[in-house]
C-alpha cells in the first residue's frame, strides 16, 4: 500500500511539473495568489458567521479577494525574477546578499502590496478613492507591523533554500494564515469608544 502511494505521488509530481515552467509558471503563480487569498477570506468569514449570529457568508467578498490576489500574482512573479537578478544569492554562503534581498522585499514590495490590497479591494467594493485612502491610513501601520513579524523569517528561508521558480508557490503556501489576517484587518470595524464615567 505504501509503495502504491509513493508511485501515485511521483506521478502527481511529474504531471504537475509543467505548471512550474515557462509561461505556465506565470499562470500558476497568478491563480495561486487568487485562490489562496479567497480561501483565507473564506476561512475568516466562516469564523465571523459562527461568532456573529445573523451575519451571512459573502461570496462577493471572497470573489473580490480572488480578483485582488490574481492581480498581485504577476507582480510577485516578476518581482522575484527581478530581485534574483539584482541580488543573485542562495544558500548559507550568500547570507549577506540574502539579507539584503529580505530588506529590499520588506521595504519595497511589502508597502506596495499593502497599498494595492486596500485600494484594490476598496475599488471592487464601491468605495471612493478618498474612502479607500482613509481606510489605508487607518489600517496600514497595523498591516505593516504584522508584515514585519511574519515575512522576514519566511523570506529568509525562501531566498536561502527555495529554487527561484518555486518562490511564489512557497509564499502562496504560507499565505493562508496571512490572508486570513488580512481579511480580518480589512473588514474589522473598531467598536465605538465609550465615554468613561457617564454611563446611563
Curated annotation (Swiss-Prot):
InterPro entries per record: Mpv17_PMP22 (IPR007248)
A single GO cellular-component term on record: mitochondrion
Cellular localisation: Membrane; Mitochondrion inner membrane
GO MF term set: mitochondrial large ribosomal subunit binding
Membrane topology designation: Multi-pass membrane protein
Family as reported in the entry's similarity comment: Belongs to the peroxisomal membrane protein PXMP2/4 family.
Function, as annotated: Required for the assembly and stability of the mitochondrial ribosome. Is a positive regulator of mitochondrial protein synthesis.
Name listed for the protein in its UniProt record: Mpv17-like protein 2
Lineage of origin: Eukaryota, Metazoa, Chordata, Craniata, Vertebrata
